[in-house]
Amino acid sequence: MITSYQRTPTGLAPSPGLVKTKPAPLWVDLSYLTRSEELAVESAFRIEVPTREEMADFEVSNRLYAYGEALYLTITLPYQLETDFPTITDLSFI
């Protein structure tokens, strides 16, 4: 799923999908992407989106890197902390 966020006079406005307007979206959330969504994002921004498997395999020393003209930061975050079974997930910022 892709959600694009555009700047508005009152803040950020979410839009479903990849918005291809000028100015470009200020923020784009990528969650559980299909392969076609992944390819669309990679093409639109000329970046490579790491898979969940790739994010999990990154050593701590490799979680901040540059590839092409993009900077990548991958972090591990806890979630479901209020439950009996908290867990963690990896999240990348590009």
List each language-model region with its residue ranges.
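Peripheral, non-transmembrane regulatory/ligand-interaction domains of membrane transport proteins
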Residues: 1-94
